[in-house]
Amino acid sequence: MTLDLSKPANAGYQSGFANEFATEALPGALPHGRNSPQRAPYGLYAEQLSGTAFTAPRGHNRRSWLYRIRPAAVHRPFEPYAGPQRLVSEFGDSADVPPTPPDQLRWDPLPMPVEPTDFVDGLVTMAGNGSAAAMNGCAIHLYAANRSMQDRFFYSADGELLIVPQQGRLFIATEFGRVEVEPFEIAVIPRGVRFSVTLPDGDARGYICENFGAQLRLPDLGPIGSNGLANPRDFLTPQAAYEDREGAFELIAKLNGRLWRADIGHSPLDVVAWHGNYAPYKYDLRLFNTIGSISFDHPDPSIFLVLQSQSDTPGVDTIDFVIFPPRWLAAEDTFRPPWFHRNVASEFMGLVHGAYDAKAEGFVPGGASLHNCMSGHGPDADTFEKASASDTTKPHKVDATMAFMFETRTLIRPTRYALDTAQLQADYFECWQGIKKHFNPEQR
C-alpha cells in the first residue's frame, strides 16, 4: 500500500494496545525468522527504532523493526528552524516560564491563523512541568492550522505526542502507515516517529500533551474487573504503507524544545514493512466504557482514566489522561456535578464538544482551564444552585459533551505566552463570586 496524503486511508488498522504487530505493504517484505538479515527483501534497509532502554523489563520494552527504502540517517545536517519558535520544554524559572500564580486560569480558544499555517507552525506551548532533557514531566501545547504540511515532515525527540483534535480532521501519514483522527478521537505518535499532517477540512484546532516520561499505558482496573474504561481492542495501529518519492523535502526535528530543520532528498515515510510494539495508534473516545455510581455520591474522577504515564511511586502517575464523556447520572440525594475540590495534583482541562457539566458558561469548545495544586475549584454559582434543587429520584443523561483533563503529579507551569495572551479570561474568578451563603445554625 502506497501513501496518498490527499485521500482517506484504505490500508486499515490492526487492533489492540501495545501488541506485537507485524505488517507489510509488499508481500514478503518482512524477513522471516530474523530481524536483520544480510540482505533484506526488495533491497530494503533494516532499522530498529527503540522507545525504551534495551534492558527494560520485557513487559515494558518498546521497540519496532522497520524495513525501509533508505535509513533514517540519510539527510543533510540540521540547522536552526527559521519559522515560529513558540515551544517550551524546560519548566524552571526563565523568560519563557514566569513565576506560577496560584489563581485559577481559563482561556478562550486559540484563534485560527490569518496567514497560511501548517501543523508545525501552528503549535504553541501553554504550560508544562519537568524537563524534556531529563525525560520527566510534560508540555501542553495547542495547535491551530489552516494548511496541510507540504513536502515537510516532523518528529519530536522530546516525547510522545497525545493529540486531541477539537476542530477538523487530521490525516497523519507516519513511517508506520496512515492514522486518521477526527474530533472525539485521539492519536498518539511515539517519540521519534516522523510524520506529516494533511488537513482535509481546511481549518484544524486541538490540544497536545507531549509526554516526556514513561510511555502512556492502560491503567489497571482493580475491583472494576477484567473489562471497562478504555478496552484494549478499541485501540487501532496502522497497517504498513509507504511512499517512494524523491525531491526537495524538509525534515523538522524538535529537540529540547527547539525546532531544527534539515534538507532531505526523499520522503522519510518509506517504510515498506515493520514489526514490533512501538508504533502510533488512535482511539475513539466514544467507545469509552464509563463507570459511575448507581447508589449515591459522585466518585473520584479517576474512574474516567483513559491512559496514564506512571511514575516511580506506586499509585501516583506522572500524567493521567481523563475524559468526561456523555453518561447517565443516577445517584440519589447526591450533588451530581463534580464537587468543589482542592487537589494535590494539578489539572489542565480542555473541551472538545458541548458544555462541561460543572460550568454553565465561559468554558467553550477549544478553550482550556488550569487549576494548579491546592487551587480551589468546582461548579460555578449557577450550576450549584440548579444541581442543589434538581430531582435526584430520576436518572439524568449528560449528553452532547466531551471534556478531558491532563492531570499531573507536579505543578503545571503556564508559559509567558499563556499568561500574556489575549485569550486569558481575566474575569474567570467571577464565576464563583455569586455563590451564596446558605449557612443557618438554627436550621439543619
Swiss-Prot record:
<dbReference type="Pfam" id="PF04209">
    <property type="entry name" value="HgmA_C"/>
</dbReference>
<dbReference type="Pfam" id="PF20510">
    <property type="entry name" value="HgmA_N"/>
</dbReference>
<comment type="similarity">
    <text>Belongs to the homogentisate dioxygenase family.</text>
</comment>
<dbReference type="InterPro" id="IPR014710">
    <property type="entry name" value="RmlC-like_jellyroll"/>
</dbReference>
<feature type="binding site">
    <location>
        <position position="356"/>
    </location>
    <ligand>
        <name>homogentisate</name>
    </ligand>
</feature>
<dbReference type="GO" id="GO:0006559">
    <property type="term" value="P:L-phenylalanine catabolic process"/>
</dbReference>
<feature type="binding site">
    <location>
        <position position="341"/>
    </location>
    <ligand>
        <name>Fe cation</name>
    </ligand>
</feature>
<keyword id="KW-0585">Phenylalanine catabolism</keyword>
<keyword id="KW-0408">Iron</keyword>
<comment type="pathway">
    <text>Amino-acid degradation; L-phenylalanine degradation; acetoacetate and fumarate from L-phenylalanine: step 4/6.</text>
</comment>
<dbReference type="InterPro" id="IPR005708">
    <property type="entry name" value="Homogentis_dOase"/>
</dbReference>
<dbReference type="GO" id="GO:0004411">
    <property type="term" value="F:homogentisate 1,2-dioxygenase activity"/>
</dbReference>
<feature type="binding site">
    <location>
        <position position="347"/>
    </location>
    <ligand>
        <name>Fe cation</name>
    </ligand>
</feature>
<dbReference type="GO" id="GO:0005737">
    <property type="term" value="C:cytoplasm"/>
</dbReference>
<dbReference type="InterPro" id="IPR046451">
    <property type="entry name" value="HgmA_C"/>
</dbReference>
<dbReference type="GO" id="GO:0006572">
    <property type="term" value="P:tyrosine catabolic process"/>
</dbReference>
<keyword id="KW-0479">Metal-binding</keyword>
<comment type="function">
    <text>Involved in the catabolism of homogentisate (2,5-dihydroxyphenylacetate or 2,5-OH-PhAc), a central intermediate in the degradation of phenylalanine and tyrosine. Catalyzes the oxidative ring cleavage of the aromatic ring of homogentisate to yield maleylacetoacetate.</text>
</comment>
<keyword id="KW-0560">Oxidoreductase</keyword>
<comment type="subunit">
    <text>Hexamer; dimer of trimers.</text>
</comment>
<feature type="active site" description="Proton acceptor">
    <location>
        <position position="298"/>
    </location>
</feature>
<dbReference type="InterPro" id="IPR046452">
    <property type="entry name" value="HgmA_N"/>
</dbReference>
<protein>
    <recommendedName>
        <fullName>Homogentisate 1,2-dioxygenase</fullName>
        <ecNumber>1.13.11.5</ecNumber>
    </recommendedName>
</protein>
<keyword id="KW-0828">Tyrosine catabolism</keyword>
<dbReference type="GO" id="GO:0005506">
    <property type="term" value="F:iron ion binding"/>
</dbReference>
<feature type="binding site">
    <location>
        <position position="377"/>
    </location>
    <ligand>
        <name>homogentisate</name>
    </ligand>
</feature>
<dbReference type="InterPro" id="IPR022950">
    <property type="entry name" value="Homogentis_dOase_bac"/>
</dbReference>
<feature type="binding site">
    <location>
        <position position="377"/>
    </location>
    <ligand>
        <name>Fe cation</name>
    </ligand>
</feature>
<dbReference type="InterPro" id="IPR011051">
    <property type="entry name" value="RmlC_Cupin_sf"/>
</dbReference>
<keyword id="KW-0223">Dioxygenase</keyword>
